[in-house]
UniProtKB/Swiss-Prot annotation:
Alphabetized UniProt keyword annotations: Cell inner membrane, Cell membrane, Glycosyltransferase, Lipopolysaccharide biosynthesis, Membrane, Repeat, Transferase
Organism: Escherichia coli
EC number(s) per entry: 2.4.1.371
Signal peptide positions (record): none
Database matches in Gene3D superfamilies: Glycogen Phosphorylase B
Protein name: Serotype-specific mannosyltransferase WbdA
Broad enzyme group: transferase
Amino acid sequence: MHILIDVQGYQSESKVRGIGRSTPAMSRAIIENAGEHRVSILINGMYPIDNINDVKMAYRDLLTDEDMFIFSAVAPTAYRHIENHGRSKAAQAARDIAIANIAPDIVYVISFFEGHSDSYTVSIPADNVPWKTVCVCHDLIPLLNKERYLGDPNFREFYMNKLAEFERADAIFAISQSAAQEVIEYTDIASDRVLNISSAVGEEFAVIDYSAERIQSLKDKYSLPDEFILSLAMIEPRKNIEALIHAYSLLPAELQQRYPMVLAYKVQPEQLERILRLAESYGLSRSQLIFTGFLTDDDLIALYNLCKLFVFPSLHEGFGLPPLEAMRCGAATLGSNITSLPEVIGWEDAMFNPHDVQDIRRVMEKALTDEAFYRELKAHALAQSAKFSWANTAHLAIEGFTRLLQSSQETDAGQAESVTASRLQMMQKIDALSEVDRLGLAWAVARNSFKRHTRKLLVDISVLAQHDAKTGIQRVSRSILSELLKSGVPGYEVSAVYYTPGECYRYANQYLSSHFPGEFGADEPVLFSKDDVLIATDLTAHLFPELVTQIDSMRAAGAFACFVVHDILPLRRPEWSIEGIQRDFPIWLSCLAEHADRLICVSASVAEDVKAWIAENRHWVKPNPLQTVSNFHLGADLDASVPSTGMPDNAQALLAAMAAAPSFIMVGTMEPRKGHAQTLAAFEELWREGKDYNLFIVGKQGWNVDSLCEKLRHHPQLNKKLFWLQNISDEFLAELYARSRALIFASQGEGFGLPLIEAAQKKLPVIIRDIPVFKEIAQEHAWYFSGEAPSDIAKAVEEWLALYEQNAHPRSENINWLTWKQSAEFLLKNLPIIAPAAKQ
């Protein structure tokens, strides 16, 4: 049996109410107790991405991403606005299409009567569908109190329409016998379709022994006295706060003085003023009523534990979570003797007539003055609350699902196709939809066709596709893309994509056609679907924050946004970067921290730096709670990086010069941090001392090195002992590596340092600065130097040569390095790739 649980009750405005508590608690219990049955959840993709993150966080310890389905539709759909009615109907159809493609046996809707004020979307089909719909009934309070709750014509229409749908449910699971009886008495639902599964509260509600410091902090935070009476509710007529205040005012003065009333209510200013005026009319001072405002769960649990008495005078509940929460925390609990509350409280002496303020006063006064009765209340609270558990509710629900399927005729799996066809026809007939709505729905329907899509692994080469500047980062992009295309990824179509500002992601098929064998078609827009993976290997800082919209959109469709982070040096040492990079990098990394699923760094050093930066900036960066930061190492085999070819005209002369004297090579774009100036000055010292050494600098001119480059162009040793080679091919670079005495890598900061690995692959010894990332990669297999004086490098070269002549120098060939194929494989291990065998 495959159970699909609609968890929108944890996304909507109900999130801060009882439904918001019971939705994750009940669904998690079903997952935990499902045994051999498969359980998935259905999430509404029209809510903000932070909302979706919260839902996924609530289940990530129990479900894989494969069992978290996000349905797409076009917002806004709130029924309260008549202009949304067409989109609302279309969203219901889109949800049906999503469910048909998920193909569950049971669709379990924990909260049904929603969608009037936000994008909550739920419906029960009137036609035959290949799944059974089971709805939870929390209460029918609006139906039983029409004058109070259904006075607004728009809401009345909405509620009555939902009620008509509700009556089509294959089964109703009520959270109390009282709620079940309401369904049987006041709807057309037969009693054999109604089951009481009860309810419960989380394990976090418990008796806790708080420290004196914690108690004092609560007192300070909420202006609490040493002892107090507690009540909890929303401000609405059925919660009966007026009667509670009236009854409290009738208590003897000494009890009022000793036990102020703490009202854990979230109130608007005008509501607060009205209640305080009411209290004053009963002779109460404002100091006798303490309003806490909204409470965190931790603080609420603490107040339950610390209160002298908890009182719940509600006129109508479907279940009544607050009394059960209070009793689980050991609080002496009193409540109304009507609707569902007798089932929860379970002791007649602890209840009162909520319509009779004298009766409320009587029971409160007895609890506060009769010590024996008070002790019984405390003991009863723990005994009674122990009868309720989410595990019991889950077992009852699963038994109900099983009986429902056993008593039903088997459905034709082919009906899923007919559901899609009929819903598409229905959408076409909705006149209220604009052309923009219809275009959005077309994308939504495509996204909701989960099973029809082969998963996609999409390599973002947004920079490379526009221009290959042949930087180290672009070598990474070329190499990773090449390996993934060559090797493939089981269960995924591998392709390249790019983003152009002001547009959307498109396939980089023209780039592929010009660089790889085969025909790839046109650069069509990308449809991101569930479980697709975007991996951005390029540095795209210049595209943020605009790209955030695309990232959130793909993630709301169930895809994953993953980014390779090469380094964050512009954040740590901004003086090493041009002004544009200094401006873009904080925006870029903060956006990645808040919106990406995975940050995959090119070294452990970079990963630690990224984590530290995010932690340091939490005052303005709000990290995605689902995000992981990991690392892999880059490859180094030039032959597999789609190398450039060709030899310069003076190749033989250069190679001859290299062979004529000990030659040292530096590789990389010339930038202030790379250490070229210090290295050149070091060799000038050595040349002045008469040392016959060559220095080969391989790399084009970068940012803020104009004076250095001018010096190189006019250096007296240029093309004698000093050689500056720009824009050479990978083929010729390999020749230089093979003939050099050692690589000098003097950079003050790197994310990884490909030249180090490329040198190791050629068994070329390395002389490097002792920065963390180099130590991570080279370990003891390199000769290290520190300091920023020319003499520091000159000394290191001399010391290394002495060791070299004794054949005692560190051996770079012992450095562990990866091929690009291996690097791509390690990258895949850091991605949310689903093995084909796991696909349902």
